[in-house]
Amino acid sequence: MRCKTLTAAAAVLLMLTAGCSTLERVVYRPDINQGNYLTPTDVAKVRVGMTQQQVAYALGTPMMTDPFGTNTWFYVFRQQPGHENVTQQTLTLTFNSSGVLTNIDNKPALTK
């Protein structure tokens, strides 16, 4: 009889403390990396006045291009470490009608 009471009490105690679990960090969550991974060295290779072909050679294919025909390329890298906040790096390159780079927007700034 006493064994059944202890077992029932242990089961109830276990159910009550299950909501207060600190196992969140124990459970493995893989790092998720998506997009164009660019280093500060890669970004430093790009200069205003380069052609689209030169930029594509230096950085690779952009993640996205502007669908409205404004000759804008987006290099986006999103990183979600297992139990940390998501970070995102966006490099936006704008070209003129001749395909020459006119503007570089690096947010947040990726520097050495």
Swiss-Prot record:
Q: Which Pfam families match?
A: BamE
Signal peptide boundaries: 1-19
The record places the lipid (N-palmitoyl cysteine) at C20
Q: Where in the cell is it found?
A: Cell outer membrane
- Does this UniProt record's set of keywords contain Signal? yes
Q: What is its main location?
A: membrane
Q: Tell me which UniProt keywords the record has, alphabetically.
A: Cell outer membrane, Lipoprotein, Membrane, Palmitate, Signal
What are the recorded GO MF terms, alphabetically?
Answer: protein-macromolecule adaptor activity
Q: Which Gene3D superfamilies match?
A: 3.30.1450.10
**Residues with lipidation of kind S-diacylglycerol cysteine:** C20
Does the record bear Signal in its keywords? yes
Membrane topology term reads:
Lipid-anchor
Q: Which GO terms describe its cellular component?
A: Bam protein complex
Q: Which HAMAP family match?
A: OM_assembly_BamE
| Quaternary organization | Part of the Bam complex, which is composed of the outer membrane protein BamA, and four lipoproteins BamB, BamC, BamD and BamE.
Q: Known NCBIfam families for this protein?
A: PRK11548.1 (NF008585)
Please explain the role this protein plays, according to its UniProt record.
Part of the outer membrane protein assembly complex, which is involved in assembly and insertion of beta-barrel proteins into the outer membrane.
Which family does this protein fall into?
Belongs to the BamE family.
Protein name per UniProt: Outer membrane protein assembly factor BamE
